[in-house]
């Protein structure tokens, strides 16, 4: 089997075909939300709204800006740590996110915002589409450097579809609370990506080992991504919460958890090195685990000290995962996790689901007040049998559903991506920008071996 990485026809045709389909589907199904439509003046009068500043745009757009930066800048630059894969890390993240948000607007729209035959599109839809793509960016981290852009587009197509179905099951059928997406975004995205990379296992990947590492400047670029993600994560976890106390509380809980996570990550990184030195991999990734783990319970009455405890624990677990678990997964289970998403998103996502279930199960009127409890968990007159323990049970069920959807979906998509005609690189040519990008002349001399697009992997 020839390893032909020439994408001259495959990539343009795939991009153009997908975009034409998006144009047609948007033309048929998508219309503006009343808050974005030119009839807003009449809508405002009908709803007795006195000012344009009460438009939903002004409540949600600041959070949308922050989330948007996280998806395109934060995730993109976080993955630039590979010394010869910076163009692809940022560029392919840009590509899959740009396609993913369009398909997510349609998939989530059909499931959540379909009225009178149309999807009504407002600023909250844009935030939710970014959330969906965030899950794809998480999965991208597992296969980084080992797949072609065509494979990434196909993976995005299927993952967005599966994400939207999983999200509908959790939020609409099980009615779980998951403001920051610990279960829907991080757990689903991580275990979907890990399953895909398990199916795409490369036995000769050691031949690219010298490129599967960082250099001084690539780690600095990755740290830029870390800082953007760390600063904006409170917006991420609070972006779609109810206005008022819930959104305020979600930002505070995330802020506290992230802060605690940094100190424990630094402590463990130093303690686990025989000379007490820090590892940039831990500082770039484990310091963010607190934001992941507090996501489900972000808008609940977790209390600031509870958020600090969550961040404290996740900093330890994530750092230990990078040191001990990632090598074990690769050597024993054949899971080649390029970015260590299991440590940043997988395990913290599961912890977040558990924390959310426990916090929901312990909710009471003393903590929330009668009206506050009803508002926090959307209890109305139809939910006469609702109890906190029941909510906790549904929260736990949501975690298992996310895991099941991720594993089954990852198996199916992994098999599809394993087909030989997607333009994937040979094992010895992984983690190399020159395969798919025109690179500066002064960098071409650094390529350690021939990048023949028909090159086959060397037999062991």
UniProtKB/Swiss-Prot annotation:
Entry GO terms, CC: apical plasma membrane; basolateral plasma membrane; cytoplasmic vesicle; plasma membrane
Pfam families membership: Ammonium_transp
PTM comment, free text: N-glycosylated.
Annotated glycosylation sites: 48
Stretches of the chain found on the membrane's Cytoplasmic side: 1-9, 83-86, 146-151, 201-219, 273-285, 329-340, 418-460
Topology relative to the membrane: Multi-pass membrane protein
Major subcellular site: membrane
Record field: catalytic activity: NH4(+)(in) = NH4(+)(out); methylamine(out) = methylamine(in); CO2(out) = CO2(in)
GO MF term set: ammonium channel activity; ankyrin binding; carbon dioxide transmembrane transporter activity
InterPro entries: Ammonium/urea_transptr (IPR029020), NH4_transpt_AmtB-like_dom (IPR024041), RhesusRHD (IPR002229)
Residue spans, topological domain Extracellular: 31-61, 108-125, 175-179, 241-251, 307, 362-396
Compartment list: Cell membrane; Apical cell membrane
Gene Ontology biological process terms, A to Z: ammonium homeostasis; ammonium transmembrane transport; intracellular monoatomic ion homeostasis; transepithelial ammonium transport
Keywords of this entry: Ammonia transport, Cell membrane, Glycoprotein, Membrane, Transmembrane, Transmembrane helix, Transport
Residues spanning the membrane: 10-30, 62-82, 87-107, 126-145, 152-174, 180-200, 220-240, 252-272, 286-306, 308-328, 341-361, 397-417
Subunit structure: Homotrimer.
Protein task: Ammonium transporter involved in the maintenance of acid-base homeostasis. Transports ammonium and its related derivative methylammonium across the plasma membrane of epithelial cells likely contributing to renal transepithelial ammonia transport and ammonia metabolism. Postulated to primarily mediate an electroneutral bidirectional transport of NH3 ammonia species according to a mechanism that implies interaction of an NH4(+) ion with acidic residues of the pore entry followed by dissociation of NH4(+) into NH3 and H(+).
Family classification: Belongs to the ammonium transporter (TC 2.A.49) family. Rh subfamily.
PANTHER family: AMMONIUM TRANSPORTER, AMMONIUM TRANSPORTER RH TYPE C
Protein name per UniProt: Ammonium transporter Rh type C
Naturally occurring in which organism (per UniProt): Sus scrofa (Pig)
């Amino acid at each position: 089997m020839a390893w032909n990485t020439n994408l001259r026809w495959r990539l343009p045709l795939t991009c153009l075909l997908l975009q034409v389909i998006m144009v047609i589907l948007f033309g048929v199904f998508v219309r503006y939300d009343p808050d974005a439509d030119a009839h807003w003046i009449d809508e405002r009068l009908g709803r007795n709204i006195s000012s344009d500043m009460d438009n939903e745009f002004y409540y949600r757009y600041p959070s949308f800006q922050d989330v948007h930066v996280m998806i395109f800048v934060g995730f993109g630059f976080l993955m630039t740590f590979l010394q010869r894969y910076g163009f692809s890390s940022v560029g392919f993240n840009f590509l899959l996110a740009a396609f993913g948000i369009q398909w997510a607007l349609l998939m989530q729209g059909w499931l959540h915002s379909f009225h009178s035959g149309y999807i009504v599109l407002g600023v909250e839809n844009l935030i939710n589409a970014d959330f969906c793509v965030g899950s794809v960016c998480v999965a991208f981290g597992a296969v980084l450097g080992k797949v072609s852009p065509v494979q990434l587009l196909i993976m995005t197509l299927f993952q967005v579809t599966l994400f939207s179905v999983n999200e509908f099951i959790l939020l609409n059928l099980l009615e779980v609370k998951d403001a920051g997406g610990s279960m829907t975004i991080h757990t689903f995205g991580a275990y979907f990506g890990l399953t895909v990379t398990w199916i795409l296992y490369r036995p000769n990947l050691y031949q690219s080992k010298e490129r599967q590492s960082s250099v001084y400047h690539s780690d600095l670029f990755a740290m830029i991504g870390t800082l953007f993600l760390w600063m904006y994560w409170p917006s991420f976890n609070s972006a779609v919460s109810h206005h008022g106390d819930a959104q305020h509380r979600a930002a505070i809980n995330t802020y506290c958890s992230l802060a605690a996570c940094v100190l424990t990550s630094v402590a463990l990184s130093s303690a686990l090195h025989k000379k007490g030195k820090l590892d940039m991999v831990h500082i770039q990734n484990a310091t963010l685990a607190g934001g992941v783990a507090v996501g489900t319970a972000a808008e609940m009455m977790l209390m600031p000290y509870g958020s600090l405890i969550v961040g404290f624990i996740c900093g330890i677990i994530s750092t230990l995962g990078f040191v001990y678990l990632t090598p074990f997964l690769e050597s024993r289970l054949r899971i080649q996790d390029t970015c260590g998403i299991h440590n940043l998103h997988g395990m913290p996502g599961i912890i977040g689901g558990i924390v959310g279930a426990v916090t929901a199960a312990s909710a009471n009127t003393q903590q929330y007040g009668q009206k506050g409890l009803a508002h926090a968990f959307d209890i109305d007159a139809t939910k006469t049998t609702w109890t906190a323990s029941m909510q906790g049970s549904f929260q736990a069920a949501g975690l298992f559903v996310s895991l099941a959807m991720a594993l089954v979906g990852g198996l199916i998509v992994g098999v599809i991506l394993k087909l030989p005609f997607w333009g994937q690189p040979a094992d010895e040519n992984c983690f190399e920008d020159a395969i798919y990008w025109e690179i500066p002349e002064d960098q071409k001399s650094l390529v350690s071996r021939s990048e023949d697009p028909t090159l086959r992997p060397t037999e062991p």
